[in-house]
Amino acid sequence: MDSKHQCVKLNDGHFMPVLGFGTYAPPEVPRSKALEVTKLAIEAGFRHIDSAHLYNNEEQVGLAIRSKIADGSVKREDIFYTSKLWSTFHRPELVRPALENSLKKAQLDYVDLYLIHSPMSLKPGEELSPTDENGKVIFDIVDLCTTWEAMEECKDAGLAKSIGVSNFNRRQLEMILNKPGLKYKPVCNQVECHPYFNRSKLLDFCKSKDIVLVAYSALGSQRDKRWVDPNSPVLLEDPVLCALAKKHKRTPALIALRYQLQRGVVVLAKSYNEQRIRENVQVFEFQLTAEDMRAIDGLNRNLHYFNSDSLASHPNYPYSDEY
């Protein structure tokens, strides 16, 4: 890895770069953009690239990685590539085929990390969000411990170097950790995490179990109308973050990213803007003081931008518990 690429050691012995590039974009953004920005991100110094079946961009992201390998910029082992198992594939017999399909799209031999994208199982099939005639999402009931066993088999088969989860709460993590015959612990839990929703209790729990917390929406969110309330406050306009940005001569986004790194959180920086992609790698060039960190801690208001109200009645809805 690049020297500026600080990494964290995972509980299975592999290493994950602490700064990642998030590739999700709303459907109205042309897929070709994902190819372009992922190449830019690798050129800017990002080595950790985060995708998923849900994002419908694995072909483009895989092509970007392969083209940067082909032109000699990086080797495959320099890149840490993540994909995720979507909720319609939780039944154990569907897990490996889903990963193989993701690999085929990206044209890669393995992923560095494969995550269960969400604990909320949905009716199997090709539709990402299966609904009934009334437009209600159709749930599936799957024992996630059996899903996890299928994930472990993917690791044993060499299709995924590491395996983890996403959007799990403490109880859901404990269910996996306490599973009889557990072979591999999840290496991480990727969750929405930013100064307005800092997940400090979940972070402490994960640290106590040697599970890395990975932050998505670390810069707030791109306010996709399908999930995000347009009236929610804009994180990067927060006066405290803006004042700290001024103090350190950085952007509010860099303050929000640096905050996570200093609390031991791996952070995903999602941007489709070339200048901001280059800017975000400056996160290693400065430090926040203990006082700065306390000021940002004080912004927490348990605000999650991603409001999956249509899923709130799901038995595995992660926000039903305190953390």
Swiss-Prot record:
This is Aldo-keto reductase family 1 member C3. It holds the Pfam family Aldo_ket_red. Keywords: Cytoplasm, Lipid metabolism, NAD, NADP, Oxidoreductase. It comes from Pongo abelii (Sumatran orangutan). It is an enzyme of class 1 (oxidoreductase). Belongs to the aldo/keto reductase family. Transmembrane segments: none annotated. NADP(+) binds at residues 20-24, 50, 166-167, 190, 216-221, 270-280. One of its GO terms (biological process) is farnesol catabolic process. Cytosolic aldo-keto reductase that catalyzes the NADH and NADPH-dependent reduction of ketosteroids to hydroxysteroids. Acts as a NAD(P)(H)-dependent 3-, 17- and 20-ketosteroid reductase on the steroid nucleus and side chain and regulates the metabolism of androgens, estrogens and progesterone. Displays the ability to catalyze both oxidation and reduction in vitro, but most probably acts as a reductase in vivo since the oxidase activity measured in vitro is inhibited by physiological concentration of NADPH. Its EC number is 1.1.1.-, 1.1.1.210, 1.1.1.53, 1.1.1.62. The active site is at Y55 (proton donor). InterPro entries: AKR (IPR020471), AKR1C (IPR044482), Aldo/ket_reductase_CS (IPR018170), NADP_OxRdtase_dom (IPR023210), NADP_OxRdtase_dom_sf (IPR036812). PANTHER family: ALDO/KETO REDUCTASE (PTHR11732). It is found in: Cytoplasm. Its main location: cytoplasm. The record marks W227, F306 as: Involved in ligand recognition and product release. Coiled coil: none annotated. The record marks L54 as: Important for substrate specificity. Pathway: Steroid metabolism. The record marks K84 as: Lowers pKa of active site Tyr. Gene3D superfamilies: NADP-dependent oxidoreductase domain (3.20.20.100). It catalyses: a 3alpha-hydroxysteroid + NADP(+) = a 3-oxosteroid + NADPH + H(+); a 3alpha-hydroxysteroid + NAD(+) = a 3-oxosteroid + NADH + H(+); prostaglandin F2alpha + NADP(+) = prostaglandin D2 + NADPH + H(+); testosterone + NAD(+) = androst-4-ene-3,17-dione + NADH + H(+). The keyword Transmembrane does not apply. One of its GO terms (cellular component) is cytoplasm. Substrate binds at H117.
